[in-house]
Amino acid sequence: MADVLTELPGVGPSTADKLIEGGYLDFMKIATATIGELTDIEGISEKAAAKMIMAARDLCDLGFKSGVELLKQRQSVWRLSTGSTELGTVLAGGIESQSVTEFAGMFGSGKTQIMHQTCVNLQMREKIFADLEGVVEEELEAPKAVYIDTEGTFRPERVVQMAEGAGIDGQTVLDNTFVARAYNSDMQMLFAEKIEDLIKGGNNIKLVIIDSLTSTFRNEFTGRGKLAERQQKLGRHMATLNKLADLYNCIVLVTNQVAAKPDAYFGVAEQAIGGHVVGHAATFRFFLRKSKGDKRVAKLYDSPHLPDSEAVFRITEKGIQD
């Protein structure tokens, strides 16, 4: 691996080892890095970092693509069911890969339940790869999920309960779900960055969940004086998640807390935390709210190609249902 990196200008065996130690295992990782990220590695100057990045981009053939090429790339997108037909209709078939989808809402609105359900549905592989041509299901590796839990709400017993409701083995779902408990924003960001190591280690990671995205940032960066620092850090985190979704054709799901919106005279009186940083980085944005009994309402209010729409779903013992 180190021998490959030495093809870059100014990279000898020693620098290659440092790059690998820093998580830069291939040209693509370097090509999509920033100069600031590479200069964090001891012994790499800004000038050297710039040369490495440009050379890596040339080797990866990064640049402009035609609309036809992008359309072909879009054909590799796969979709994952939430368990609700109505919600699937709103999403034109399910949650898309190569994107970050946000579910925001008050406590009890169903955010974590949807996250648990997608871990279960990920193992129903015929739903995942049904739209991909030339794929033989028997040849597929078991898809795996990564669940970064920042609020201590992941419950393996609930996953088993949902799996049984779907008619699949709960132990299989848990075996194929990596869980990490993040107690602060640094841990949260580190776990997200380590996902690439899992993939390169042979794990077929197809689903990444952050539950919740902003809670650690919100707790650590209090007051207006720290708002800019919080947003910069959150922006870097979102960039990591978008890169994972794009490079590895996986789904990234994030839940988000809400805050009161005192100047709202009509419509929803809450807004998702994270401001424009999260708003611009998330591909699809949902707002969840409680309804009567076990019913919940999911409103899609931001998407690059789908209209605003609502879906009603239920949270039952078996999981997410219509």
Swiss-Prot record:
Keywords: ATP-binding, DNA damage, DNA recombination, DNA-binding, Nucleotide-binding. One of its GO terms (molecular function) is ATP hydrolysis activity. One of its GO terms (biological process) is DNA recombination. Pfam families: HHH_5, Rad51. SMART domains: AAA (SM00382), HhH1 (SM00278). PROSITE patterns: RECA_2 (PS50162), RECA_3 (PS50163). ATP binds at G105, M106, F107, G108, S109, G110, K111, T112. PANTHER family: MEIOTIC RECOMBINATION PROTEIN DMC1_LIM15 HOMOLOG, RECA/RAD51/RADA DNA STRAND-PAIRING FAMILY MEMBER. Involved in DNA repair and in homologous recombination. Binds and assemble on single-stranded DNA to form a nucleoprotein filament. Hydrolyzes ATP in a ssDNA-dependent manner and promotes DNA strand exchange between homologous DNA molecules. HAMAP family: RadA_arch. Belongs to the eukaryotic RecA-like protein family. This is DNA repair and recombination protein RadA. It comes from Methanococcus maripaludis (Methanococcus deltae). The gene is radA.
